[in-house]
Amino acid sequence: MRLLHTADWQIGRQYGRFAPEDALALAEARFSAVERLARLATEQAVAAVLVAGDVFDAQTVSDRTVRRLFNAMQGFSGPWILIPGNHDAALAESVWHRAKRLGAIPTHVEVLLEPGVYAFPQSGIAVLAAPLTQRQTSADLTAWFDNAESPEGLLRLGLAHGSVQGQLADDIDSPNPIAAERAARARLDYLALGDWHGLKRIDERTWYSGTPEQERFKNNGAGQALIVDFEQSGQPPRVTAHQVGEFQWRQWQETLGVDSDIDRLIERLEALPAPAVLALNLAGDTDLAGHQRLIQALAEAEARHRSVQYDLSALRLQPTDADVAALDADGYLGDVIDELRAQQSLHDDEASRDALVLLAGLLRERLPQAASSAEESALGMGTLEREDNA
């Protein structure tokens, strides 16, 4: 017997911190992740797909989004078994009721809106479902599992959405609690959980699958789904993680001091597998030449990856004498550069740093033009001399 366990699709999620083009691509990636889940389920010949809540990111997603989600599930013709989570709770009027009215839910998709034991004899499983009927509760909605009866001969599976107490980093006074020993107490063959967006093993029969498409800068194993194999009756299942997500999210903190630091950062950027979503915070010191190299490398990274966001506000610009000489700035402009250097050095003034960068860029643009004008002038002088000698 083989099952696929997934959760926290968050269909309809918005990405307000990103540029519109990137935000749209990240939202679309969540539909693509569901399509890949369907392919994985078909390739692995699973008996059913268990989806442990938060299928939708909000109750207010559009009708089109609802229809698109169920269309994305068509790649697997076996049973999909879903429960609502805190984002799409089974309220008196919910996104699930709207989906039913739209006729959007295919016949092979089962949405379990009420707690209970649901038998799927063709798949060989009985699902003890604990859907959320409100966004938050202080009660353990899986407590009734302990005394619930299920049909003989079927695997006894729990399906729930919440926070296993004492196991998660963010679970202090968290809503929707679940007892850590629930699988053992309730004699479950497996407890499929959602709500924690990373991959996490609670015990040999209790797992969080995490979200199939990463959406946060956390190194917690997001972007995967679980294939669960039951090989011997009464024995714990064999659980295998499969990569599903498209984008890897990375958050880097870098402190620069010497040229080799910039070299290493550029090498790291070039080695980052594409496509990625990168947030980069830089601190330390760099000269003008190093700053120019850094900006060029970031521009190239932006072209390779889905999103590159960087914060240079803590990076101090320390132009060297060689930097200033290369700009060929004298007179008033030279005095301005000296003043900006002093302001930026003494007061770590962000406005002075930005002005230095802008002025340096303008002067660099002027240098090729000046060289070109001098060359044209020299060519013209040579022509006049030839004409005079003719």
Report the location of each language-model feature.
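Short loop/turn motifs at secondary-structure junctions
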Residues: 45-46, 154, 187, 274-276, ...
